[in-house]
C-alpha cells in the first residue's frame, strides 16, 4: 500500500495558487531539465490563463519522499459552485493560500466554508511575503477570525502556518528567514494532512468529474471511497435517479504527474480515472456488481440567472463562424451539460432555435459563451434575467453578498450607487487608506454594476460577490437611462458622418466598420433611441475644393468586453457573438415595425 495524501488548494484569483503548484511539481521532479515551462500548468484552457481564474478543476500528483500527494485544484469563484463541492469531496485536507498583503478575500470564504463543513483539515500558506508593505502577521489574524466566524472546530482552528513566496520558490515557518526551496511545505503536508481512511468492503467510487479522450471516449474520475477497483472488473453503476446498470472496467488509470498512468488495481483513498464505462453522469456511484450500494450524490447549487440563447439571424449571419445552425448550437449546449453541473438548458416552446440557459451568475454564463465563440460558433444572447421563486406565496429573488474594496475618498460614491440598486450596507471596515464595504444586494442590482463601480472609482475598486439566499422581492431598480443610437441602413461607416454625429453620444464603432440596419452603434445622450445614418459619405462638387474642409476629428470608440455588453443591453436588445466580433442589436431590426411594437 502506498502512502497517499489528497489535498485541495483554495485561493483567491491572483494569490499565486497556480504558481505554487508549478513549484511543487518542480520539487517532485515532474519536469525534465530544459523542458519549456509554460507557467501556470493548471490553468490549461486559454480563457483561464487570460482571466486568471480557474474554471474547471484539475488533478496533478507528485511523489515526495515515498508519499504520493494528489493535488486537487479548486475553482475560486462562487459562480462555479457546482464544481467546488464535487472537488472537495475528493480531498482529506486543504491548503488555504492567501496573499500577505490582501488577506483572505470574499470569494475564498465561499470555498473555505464548504471545505470546513466537510471537515477538511486546513494548512494556511501566507504567500507573496517578499512584496513591499505586506503584513503577514495581520493576515494570519484575519484568517483565524475568518475560520472562527465560519464555525471551524477546535482541531481545524489549530492550523499550521507556512510563510513564503511561490514566485521565488521558497517556504518557511518564519517569514523573516527565507529558505532556498519549498520542502518545508511538502513535509508539513505529509505530517499534518491525514492519510485516507482504509475502509474494507465492496468497492465504492463516486464519480466527481469527467474527462474526455477522442481515443477512448468519456472517462470517469473520482476517489475510491471503499475497497479496491481492479482492471477488467465487473461493476454496477448506480445512477442519481436510483436506476442501476451493469458494466465492465476496460482500463484503470491513476494520476501521475500531469498525466495518467495505467495500473492493475487502485486502493481505497486514491484518485483514479476509469475508462470503458458507458452512460454515466457526475454524481453516479461505481460499485460492486453483486451488492451495489450507492453513495449519497452531491447536492449542487441551484441556478440564479437565465439567458436566452438563439441562432444568429442578423444580416451578417454566417460570415465569420463555422457553426451557425440551430443543430450545432443545440448539440454544443447538450455536450456542455455533461460537464457543467450547475447549468440548465430548456428549449423554448414552439421554437427550434431558441433556448433558455440558466447558470450561477453572469460570469458562469459568459465563460460558456466566450468558449463557444472561440470554438467557431455564432449565436445571439439576450439580457440576463434573474430567476424568481415563490416561497410561501411570496415572490422572492436571489440576494448576494457584495464586497467592494476602494480608496477612502470613493466610499460615499460606492454606497450611493449600491443603495440606489436596493442594496443594504452591512459593514464598513477601514484598512488604512482603503475601506472594505459589505452589502446585501439583489442579483438584479449587480447586473451592470461592475462597469459603473470601476468608472466611479477611476479603476481602483476591487469588487466580489456571492449568492447568499432568496429573500422577498425588493421592488423595481432603475436600469441604464440613456437610449441607443441605431444604424439606419446597412453599409460601411464613414468618418464624415460619425464626425457630424459625435455631439449626439458616444460610439461603439470606428470609421470603416461594416454595420447593418438595426445595429446599436452608440449610446445616445438622451433617454430616447435615435436612428442615425453613419453610412453617408461626403458629396464632392466643383464648388468645394477637395482640401479646404476641416479634417474629421473622431473620438475613439468605446470598447466593451462580453460581460459589459451583456450588462449593457436592454430588454429589446441582443448581443450578437461571432468568433471575430461582438455587436449589439435591436431584436426587431426594422425601424417601422419596432415603432409599432413599442406603441402596442
Predicted regions and their residues:
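Conserved catalytic-core segments of large NTP-driven translation/proteostasis enzymes
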Residues: 148-282, 402-407, 440, 466, ...
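P-loop NTPase switch module centered on the Walker A-proximal segment
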Residues: 1-104, 142, 210-213
